[in-house]
Regions:
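Catalytic-core environment of secreted peptidases
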Residues: 1-20, 76
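Residue-level detector of conserved, well-ordered beta-strand and adjacent loop positions
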Residues: 7, 94, 148, 199, ...
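Active-site-proximal helix/loop segments of hydrolytic enzymes
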Residues: 2-4, 26-191
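Loop/helix-junction capping segments adjacent to catalytic residues or to phosphate/diphosphate-binding pockets
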Residues: 22, 57, 204
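Glycine- and acidic-residue-enriched helix-capping/strand-helix junction motifs
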Residues: 16-30
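Solvent-exposed beta-strand motifs enriched in subsets of small alpha/beta binding domains
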Residues: 187-229
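Short, solvent-exposed loop/turn elements at domain surfaces
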Residues: 14-16, 103, 206
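Glycine-centered flexibility sites
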Residues: 9-12, 16, 90, 150, ...
């Protein structure tokens, strides 16, 4: 059983970056919830923990404490970006510039590639995989990747984020990357269909009356003439 912390950045009294009609905290949360739902619907063998699943403020130390208490295998920090220059745009991911868990850089590479497969079709920039001294990548007791999906302060990037279904797609791409990293087993979907025979009647009229009653309950039906030997 693999343990994953999906952390939507900012929240509540801390909206994060604001621009072009978007609050970063809202965008982060939507992507995080989509990632959670995708992993739960598509994969087994994991436990998911979210420091926040609604618009509330959760401090960085509280997020670290949660990660410690659940002994997480992976911490993914979901963020969007901002710049004083509104021309700044694109997708980038970060790990810490100092000592790392042995697997962290490979995890970053996989997550970055999976999300870029979506964003490369949108005409934005690939700013690459980077290392820096962010608090979250420095202090989490698990391999940590900081996602900076797009710049809310850039009009073109903001327009991408506003596209119908885009935040869901980004969450699902992130979830697919996580599944690859941790080699999560896909859920087996049973596609078999079952037929229920409701009864056998001597009269065709009675059979059709019973069929209509089933239709009224929302069931599909068929009447079959069964020849007796």
């Amino acid at each position: 059983m693999r343990t994953i912390v999906l952390s939507a950045g900012h929240g509540g009294s801390d909206p994060g970056a604001v621009g072009n009609g978007l609050r970063e905290s809202d965008v982060n949360l939507a992507i995080t919830l989509a990632c959670r739902d995708y992993l739960n619907d598509s994969y087994s063998g994991h436990r998911l923990f979210l420091p926040r699943d609604k618009d509330v403020y959760v401090s960085l130390p509280a997020r670290r404490n949660l990660t410690t208490s659940v002994n997480a295998d992976l911490y993914v920090s979901m963020h969007n970006n901002a710049a004083s220059n509104p021309a700044g745009r694109g997708f980038e991911t970060f790990t810490h510039s100092g000592p790392l868990f042995a697997s962290t850089l490979e995890y970053q590479k996989i997550l970055h590639a999976q999300v870029w497969r979506v964003l490369m079709q949108q005409g934005t920039l690939n700013r690459g995989t980077k290392r820096a001294n962010h608090w979250v990548t420095r202090n989490m007791p698990a391999p940590t990747v900081l996602m900076e999906y797009l710049f809310v302060t850039n009009a073109a990037d903001a327009a991408i984020l506003k596209k119908p279904g885009m935040l869901k797609t980004l969450g699902e791409a992130t979830g697919e990357g996580i599944a690859k990293i941790l080699k999560l087993p896909a859920k087996v979907v049973d596609t078999r269909r079952w037929i229920v025979i409701a009864g056998e009647y001597e009269s065709e009229q009675i059979a059709r009356e019973k069929a209509y009653a089933l239709k009224g309950l929302g069931f599909h039906y068929a009447t079959v003439d069964v020849k007796k030997n």
